From Swiss-Prot:
Name this protein carries in UniProt: NADH-quinone oxidoreductase subunit K
Keyword Calcium annotated: no
UniProt subunit comment: NDH-1 is composed of 14 different subunits. Subunits NuoA, H, J, K, L, M, N constitute the membrane sector of the complex.
Species: Roseiflexus castenholzii (strain DSM 13941 / HLO8)
GO MF term list: NADH:ubiquinone reductase (non-electrogenic) activity; quinone binding
One of the GO BP terms on file: ATP synthesis coupled electron transport
Length: 100
C-alpha cells in the first residue's frame, strides 16, 4: 500500500502547479484549468485523509465538490464563449466586461 505522505505530497505538488498556472497565465481557459487542478488536488488530499481515518464522509464530500466544480466549469465556459464572441480574445488583461 502506498503511504499517505506520498498522496499528500502529490496533492501539494498539483496544488502548487495550479497556483503557478493562475499566477503566470493570462488566458482565461488556462486559468479555469488551473483552478480545476487546484480543486482536484484538494479533493485528493481530502480523500487521502478520509482513507487514513477509514471514513466514508470525506469521499462523499469530494463527490459533492466534484458536482459543484462541474457546474462551475459549465457556467465559466459559457461566459468565456460569450465574451470571446464579443471581444474576440480570451486574454484576461484585455477583457474588461464591466466597462462595456
Amino acid at each position: 500500500m502506498v503511504p499517505t505522505s506520498y498522496y499528500i505530497l502529490l496533492s501539494a505538488l498539483l496544488f502548487t502547479l495550479g497556483v503557478v498556472g493562475v499566477i503566470t497565465r493570462r488566458n482565461a481557459l488556462v486559468l479555469f484549468m488551473s483552478v480545476e487542478l487546484m480543486l482536484n488536488s484538494a479533493n485528493l488530499a481530502l480523500v487521502t485523509f478520509a482513507m487514513a481515518r477509514q471514513d466514508v464522509a470525506g469521499q462523499i464530500v469530494v463527490f459533492f465538490v466534484i458536482v459543484v466544480a462541474a457546474a462551475e466549469v459549465a457556467v465559466g465556459l459559457a461566459l468565456l464563449v460569450a465574451i470571446f464572441r464579443t471581444k474576440h480574445t480570451t486574454d484576461v488583461d484585455e477583457i474588461n466586461a464591466l466597462r462595456g
